[in-house]
């Protein structure tokens, strides 16, 4: 079976957190805010903890999962500080979710049939019994965590042949370890089943926007933060990504419609194709023999992102809710267990249907109420400030904003319909941050006056207003250490109060950067190895975004290009600062004709070699 590999390397290239100052204490306002959370939610409900521990078989005794070179891939025991009551430096609701996510090991989901390894990475790896072997669902972020999970299964459940590897969607925490699984299994007949468009989407997301997304990733997942009660306590969707080698493998089979069935070694599966919701392409799986439903990442124990803070395409809350309703209609009468590729399973037909319905209603509500209020003339910021979930949803832990948030999800649905402009003429052509900051500071009466007003706001617990004041001052006077330190203190308190893991991580990472505790160099997540796996057409699109159009605006250059490794030809035309191409065309008047492999071309445009 011919395979092409994609070296993601995302986790390897991200900087480790630098040692910082002593942990900042929570202010009385933050303590009060976090104490109030305990009165709003039923922390005596321990059902999730019972489900998260149910079926436990074994876990690794090691302190960490390690890469081949001895470096830490995933710190298994780094989350022990989460034991006990939430401190004042953490939102108790997020702390509870993080405790659940930190539970790790091999678990039985359906006796003798379905097993999960959880807590070895951000996402789970699932094993489903066929007549004579296994189907593996998803492969975590990296080689080390995927192999650790697979070897734990072999140790406790036997060394059975793997008949198929299913990857539910093209996010790296689900496919990064797939090549390692393929090599470990060494079964040339093993099927690799993915949703249609998986390979292209995996490449495009991690390459086309990889550099900017990589830096935002490091903020969102708290990769630059220490793991303690004043730092990274998890993402809400899981703990954190493993670090190490990640490779993409070409699939052998694609699912493109709902209702498609496959029988692998005697086990029947029915697929639901659910694109443009949690991921550009994704699929869920029904196992009729086991009355078990794999919800991929469409139904989880959190309010998910309708627009992820790391950056991606907006997700359609209406479509998402309809997919879940279709799940209920198709399988609600028969299901006995539902499991996802994050978090823990849910058992029992009635309990599952209640859980599914709440998730469906939550996404529908966010979508519909955003549009209702937009049609009444409210801006996205106003909607996000005013909208609340109904009590029946708001009181459910599975509908809390641990990963997404009501605030930024509402803004995403507004953006999906109306774009970035809120309709206020003042926001049509605003000043850029530095110029705005300078005029803002001047209008208030200078930097010292801004700090005076900001300190008063800080002392009164008005952290959002304080952040606005100081953000403008830092843009106006980036070397003003008093402003930077105070803004870092503000971000820290906002992080301590945040129920969303990504919000907390963004705030606390921003605080570290303001204090000078982070290497500000942008991680380079794109290299020739990854880029050269793009198809020729997408590779040339990637080439085009490397062009500085403002410098090339007066140039007109035509080049004929032949890729020797795949045989494809293209005509490239640089004109008016834009680089267009036509696949399969040549131009007799071209300045030059070039024959090159995709790898050498990628190295050339990434300046890894000189022309």
What are these regions (language model features)?
Residues 68-88, 197-247:
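Acidic/polar short surface loop at catalytic or gating sites that assists cofactor/ion binding
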Residues 453-456, 462-468, 472-479, 484, ...:
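Feature captures hydrophobic
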Residues 25-38, 292, 302, 318-382, ...:
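Divalent-metal (often Zn2+) His-rich catalytic cores of metallo-beta-lactamase-fold enzymes
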Residues 99-160, 283-287, 291-297:
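Conserved beta-strand hairpin/beta-sheet module of binuclear metal-dependent hydrolase folds
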Residues 358, 426-450:
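TPR-adjacent "capping" and linker segments in tetratricopeptide-repeat scaffold/adaptor proteins
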Residues 23-98, 102-103, 324:
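N-terminal pre-domain segments of enzymes
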Residues 133-135, 141-144, 243, 247-253, ...:
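Metallo-beta-lactamase
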Residues 132-133, 144-193:
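Active-site metal-binding motif and surrounding structural segment of the metallo-beta-lactamase
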């Amino acid at each position: 079976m011919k395979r092409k590999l994609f070296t993601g390397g995302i986790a390897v290239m991200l900087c480790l957190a630098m040692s910082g100052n002593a942990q900042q204490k929570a202010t009385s306002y933050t303590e009060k805010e976090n104490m109030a959370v305990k009165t709003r939610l039923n922390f005596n409900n321990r059902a999730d903890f019972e489900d998260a521990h149910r079926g436990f078989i074994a876990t690794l005794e090691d302190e960490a999962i390690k890469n081949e070179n001895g470096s830490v891939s995933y710190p298994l025991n780094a989350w022990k500080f989460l034991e006990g009551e939430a401190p004042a430096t953490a939102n108790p609701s997020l702390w509870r979710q993080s405790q659940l996510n930190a539970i790790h090991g091999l678990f039985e989901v359906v006796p003798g049939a379905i097993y999960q390894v959880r807590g070895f990475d951000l996402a789970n790896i699932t094993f489903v019994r066929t007549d004579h072997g296994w189907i593996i669902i998803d492969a975590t972020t990296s080689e080390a965590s995927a192999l650790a999970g697979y070897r734990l299964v072999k140790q406790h459940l036997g060394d059975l042949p793997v008949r198929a590897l299913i990857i539910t969607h093209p996010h790296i925490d689900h496919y990064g370890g797939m090549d390692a699984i393929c090599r470990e299994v060494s079964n040339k007949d093993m099927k690799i089943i993915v949703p249609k468009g998986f390979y292209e989407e995996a490449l495009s997301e991690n390459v086309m926007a990889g550099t900017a997304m990589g830096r935002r990733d490091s903020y969102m997942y708290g990769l630059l933060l220490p793991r303690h009660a004043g730092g990274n306590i998890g993402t809400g969707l899981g703990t954190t990504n493993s670090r190490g080698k990640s490779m993409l493998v070409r699939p052998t089979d694609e699912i493109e419609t709902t209702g498609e069935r496959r029988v692998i070694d005697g086990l029947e599966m029915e697929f639901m194709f659910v694109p443009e919701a949690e991921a550009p392409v994704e699929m869920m799986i029904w196992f009729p023999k086991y009355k078990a439903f794999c919800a991929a990442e469409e139904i989880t124990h959190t309010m998910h992102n309708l627009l992820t803070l790391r950056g991606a395409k907006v997700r359609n809350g209406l479509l998402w809710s309809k997919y879940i309703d279709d799940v209920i209609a198709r399988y609600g009468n028969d299901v006995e267990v539902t499991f996802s590729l994050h978090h823990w399973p849910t058992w029992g037909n009635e309990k599952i249907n209640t859980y599914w319905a709440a998730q469906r209603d939550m996404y529908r509500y966010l979508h519909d109420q955003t549009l209702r209020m937009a049609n009444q003339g409210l801006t996205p910021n106003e909607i996000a400030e005013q909208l609340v979930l109904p009590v029946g949803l708001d009181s459910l832990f599975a509908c809390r904003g641990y990963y997404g948030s009501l605030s930024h999800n509402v803004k995403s649905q507004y953006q999906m319909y109306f774009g970035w402009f809120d309709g206020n003429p003042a926001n049509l052509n605003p000043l850029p941050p530095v110029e705005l900051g300078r005029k803002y500071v001047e209008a208030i009466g200078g930097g010292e006056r801004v700090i005076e007003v900001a300190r008063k706001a800080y002392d009164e617990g008005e952290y959002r207003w304080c952040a606005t004041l100081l953000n403008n001052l830092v843009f106006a006077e980036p070397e003003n250490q008093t402003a930077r330190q105070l803004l870092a203190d503000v971000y820290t308190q906002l992080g301590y109060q945040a129920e969303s893991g990504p919000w907390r991580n963004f705030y606390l990472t921003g605080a570290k950067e303001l204090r000078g505790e982070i290497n500000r160099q942008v991680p380079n997540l794109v290299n020739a190895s990854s880029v050269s796996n793009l198809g020729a057409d997408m590779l040339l699109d990637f080439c085009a975004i490397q062009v500085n159009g403002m410098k090339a605006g007066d140039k007109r250059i035509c080049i004929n290009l032949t890729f020797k490794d795949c045989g494809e030809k293209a005509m490239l035309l640089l004109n008016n600062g834009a680089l267009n191409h036509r696949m399969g065309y040549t131009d007799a008047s071209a300045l030059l004709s070039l024959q090159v492999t995709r790898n050498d071309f990628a190295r050339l445009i990434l300046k890894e070699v000189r022309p």
